[in-house]
Amino acid sequence: MEGGAARIGGRVHRLPQGYLALVVPEETILARGTTDAAADVRCQGTIVAEAAPQDPTWSDVPGELLTFDDPQKRLPRIDRLEGFHPGALSLYQRVLLPIRGANGLRAAAWAYVEGELARRS
């Protein structure tokens, strides 16, 4: 596993349960996570992430970009840890977003954003 600093456009707020949640502009979501981790990894590999226009009403949210040598095995485990259940109400949902790395890298990366269950809280 490798890591590095990254940024995305969005907002972070605290849920009533005390957890932090990321909210992103709907139009920046490139894909949504599914139950097929291998297909999700292939999808990520085919998308060229263009720089999303920076809307002044959204913030530049710092985060950490992690890369794995075995994402097909890791994604389902991380999904469970984050409480993401594709096709069901979830506290978080996994979405593919354009990110900007510290070195100027632009890429598409999976992130966990506020899910329907959190919005109902």
Which stretches of residues belong to each language-model region?
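Glycine-aromatic micro-motifs
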Residues: 1-121
